[in-house]
Amino acid sequence: MPGIAEESIAERTRRVLEPVLARDGYELVEVEWLRQGSRWTLRLFVDKPGGVGIEDCQAVSRLVDPILDVEDFIEPAYDLEVSSPGLDRPLRKPADFDRYAGQRAHVKAYGPVAGTAPGSPARKNWTGVLVGYRDGAVEIDVDGVVHRVPHDQIAKAHLEYDFEADLRRKD
């Protein structure tokens, strides 16, 4: 199946399932449609306040499986997987950047972006502490300098778990 079909399946899955999951208190964070060996996999990443456990993944699977069967828009046989977004949770929506303000994150642009901070050279990657989302841009503090990255220039963004900070808190 070509890449465009993969995008269409993921997009349609999101459109169909997002409102259903929201009614049950879940956020559909990510949808992946991928081939693993000879099998196709539809992978859903879900979250809710307080986090997601194995019971939640099972409940979501039981909820969406019959809906996907009725909608019947996925042509090849596939395996359905439901998972939490994990420690490196993807950040996509403007609200994600505000929700996780104060946490460590990595932001990657499609290409070099100039003028993200005064005197800063064009760059493609930023790793630092999220400040939030304002006026169409993600603000991220990198070593004490706040950079503003236009949201429409972001290819990928995700949380980065700070193991060293966690170890310091436990000492």
Swiss-Prot record:
InterPro entries: Ribosome_maturation_RimP, RimP_C, RimP_C_sf, RimP_N, RimP_N_sf. It is found in: Cytoplasm. Keywords: Cytoplasm, Ribosome biogenesis. Its main location: cytoplasm. GO terms for cellular component: cytosol. GO terms for biological process: ribosomal small subunit assembly; translation. SUPFAM superfamilies: YhbC-like, C-terminal domain, YhbC-like, N-terminal domain. Belongs to the RimP family. This is Ribosome maturation factor RimP. It comes from Anaeromyxobacter sp. (strain Fw109-5). The gene is rimP.
